[in-house]
Amino acid sequence: MVLQRIKIPKLLVKPVGRAIADFSMIRDGDRVLLAVSGGKDSLSLFHILRHFQRHAPINFDLGVVTIDPEVEGFEPQALESFFQRFETPYFFEEFPIMEQAKQSMKGDSYCSFCARIKRGLMYQVARRENYNVLALGQHLDDLAESLMMSMCHNGKIQTMKAHYVNDAKDIRIIRPLVYVRERQLASFAQELKLPVIADSCPACFSMPTEREHFKQWLLSEEQRTPNLYKNLLSAMKPMLDEVND
């Protein structure tokens, strides 16, 4: 696969470019570490960020990190060779997250525990390799689902941030896909035949998640209200930026 031959659809370039500009996500001289699980979202974001490396009026470095939770069925070997073809720095970290969860998890969901452990490991890699920005692949559907979960279960109107700083104040976290729909990414990944790794988390298979429940509810509601996600984005936008408030 040759980068110059990959055409990124305007339906992806425009919303990602607008999000990067709206929230000042990437600045000249930044070193951006992209978290890649092997899913369609993060792999698509890799190509989009490479596009902006070539065409944006700023210069930034791009590296990739994968956290292997050491669960049966997760086979990330194809990712290393994939990123080698683009001469992209690739960092691979292993950690027995499920085993750790059995010993240490208290009053939390597996998904929340796993996300917290992975985030800590990614911060370690970013510091060790001198990256100041961590890019994550959540999209508009994810933000809408988080909003509904927070309102219904916690009584709070909040969702994931598009841009914020970690507690240690040394790494900025960005989500360039906040204006992009999941189905757009699925179509792009399929068209490019990206080496997508299927979700193999046993916790997700053993119990339906609340996120999946709200995902299906929102998609069903969208059939009745075609502008649903556009309206939800308008409602969420004031709460998405922590860095530039």
Regions found by a protein language model. Name each.
Residues 241-245:
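Hydrophobic helical membrane-anchoring modules
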Residues 2-147, 153, 183-191:
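ATP-dependent adenylation/nucleotidyltransferase module used to activate substrates
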Residues 141-220:
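Catalytic subdomain that performs nucleotidyl-dependent activation
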